[in-house]
Amino acid sequence: MDRRQFLATLAAAAASTALPSGWALASHSEDWTWLQGNWRVRHQRLKERLVGDTRWESFTGSSAVWLTLGGLGTIDDNVMALPSGPYRGLGVRAFDPVSSTWSIWWIDGRNPAHIEAPVRGGFEGDAGSFRGTDRIDGRPIDVWFRWHDIHGEEPWWEQAFSDDAGAHWEVNWRNWFRRTAAAPSPLPKLPDAPGDFDFLVGHWNVRHRRLRARLAGSDAWDTFNGTLHNWPVLGGFGNVGDNLMDVPGAPLRGMGIRAWNAAEQHWLSWWLDGREPTRIGAPLRGGFQAGVGRFFGEDQHDGRSIQTRVIWSRITPRSARWEQAASADGGRSWETNWVSDFERQA
C-alpha cells in the first residue's frame, strides 16, 4: 500500500475503531501472539513532522515482546539505532473487556518519568487500528497507529499524525519486522545501567498475606499464592513484572512497571491492575540503600487521600520480601496491608 492509498484508508475508517461485537474474551488473549518473540526491525522515519517535509531517514532496531496478563497484555522492549544515537523505548498494552479495546502506552527511555497518553483500538482480520491524541510543539494532534500483514512473514506498522481533527493525515514512521526468535529473550543490558532490580529478574513463586480491610483497625488477613515473571527492559534502566495472584474469590493479574529516572536519581514504579486495564496508576518514587528499597507515593482510599509506602527487603539470590503500607496522617504512622514473600523457581 502506498502513502496515498494509506491516507485514503485512514479517511474512510476514521469514524470508528470498534471491534466486532460478541467476541469472547478468551479470543483476545491471542490478539498479540503473532508479535511474541524477538525481532529485527527496519525503520523509515520522516525527518520533520507536520511541516510538509518529504525527507526520510532509515535505520535499524531490535524488539523483544512478551505476553502478560494471561495474554490480555504485552510488553514491548525496543532499541533503535537513530542517526543521532541509540534510542530505547517501552510499549505497554492491555485489553479492556468492557470497551473491547486495547490501550497502548509508550515510555520514552530518554524521559521515563512521563508515560505518554494511550492510543486505543483493536484488530480486524490481518490489520490493527489504534487512535489517540498527543501534542507536538505545543499544539494538539490526533495520532493513528496501524498494523498490517500481522500474520505474514514481515508484519509492518505505521504511524500518522493529523493537526486538523483528522481531515488530513501525514504518515511519519514505518517499521518492518523480521522474526529472529520465537521465544522472547531480553535485549542487551547497558554497562552503566543500575543494578538495583537485578535480583528480581526471572520466575518466582510468591506467598501473599493481605489485610482484608485497610485503615479500619482490622487484624484479619487473607493468605494466598501467586507467581511473578520479571524481565529487564530499557537496557537495564527498567523492568516489568507479570503477576498472577490467587486472591480468594477471583484471581488477580497485574503488571509492575519500573524505570530509572537518571535526572532525579530515583526509580519510578507503576502498577497496571488487570481489573482496570484502561489506566496505569500514579507512580511510587524511591530507591535502595544498604540493600533495602523504599518507595513512596500518593493514592486514594474510600474517597480520601492517603500515602503509600513499599519496602523491598530480605533480598538474597533466591528470595525477597515486598511490603506495602498506607498512612492516613501524612506519614506519621503506617499500617502494613500486604506482605509478599518471593522464592525463586528452580
Residue ranges of model-derived segments:
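Conserved Ser/Thr-centered positions that define the repeating blades of beta-propeller domains
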Residues: A160-D163, A325-S327
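N-terminal export signals
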Residues: Q5-A24
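A glycine-anchored, Pro-Gly-centered beta-turn/N-cap motif
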Residues: G37-N38, L200-H203
